[in-house]
Amino acid sequence: MSSPVDSIRDKLIDALKVSDERHREQRADRIIWMSTYRSRPGVIVGRPETLAMLDEAEDAFREGHFISVQLLALAFVEHTIVEELVGRSLSKERVNFERAIELAQSNQVLDTKLLSRIDRLREIRNPFAHRRPHDDPDTYGNRYISRQIHPRAMLEQDAREAFQVMYLVFSALLKAA
């Protein structure tokens, strides 16, 4: 005789099968898209937290968790830039992201256009990470209303941009072991 938990579990598995089938093609398309940006050497050495964010951002993108992609990709970028600044004795360990971008700019750590993209993504990410006033033009609601775009489409565009930038930073600051 099955328990109530087993019955619920069976129903959940059936529902998940339907959901998996419904989203499979979109996941496949996202995996193909990611493969054009994702390039890694055989072995990567780095801080476990930083590398875990890289992996988690990929998982989140594949599954369509676009806000998570933005948060994880930008956290990865922040960690990587700060680590580079510290390694070059240009900064202390604790520097905020905006200041790290400024230091990277003034010390030519990364390409100016890439740093501009990073800073814009930081502005887009901030309302998810830090409470903002209702009239802040970078809040999620204000952005999709002003752009006259479906919220989910905008989130996916932002996630794609964050993912691209994450891998551009990864490639630019990758060091040979």
Question: Language model features by range: what are they?
Answer:
Residues 16, 31-35, 89-94, 134-136:
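Short, structured secondary-structure boundary patches
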Residues 1-65:
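Charged alpha-helical initiation segments
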Residues 112-177:
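Charge-enriched, short contiguous segments at helix-coil
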Residues 37-91, 159-168, 172-177:
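Amphipathic alpha-helical interface segments
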Residues 18-22, 107, 172, 176:
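Surface-exposed polar/charged interaction patches
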Residues 71, 75-115, 135:
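Flexible secondary-structure boundary motifs
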Residues 38-40, 107, 148:
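A short, mixed-charge helix-start or loop-turn motif at secondary-structure junctions
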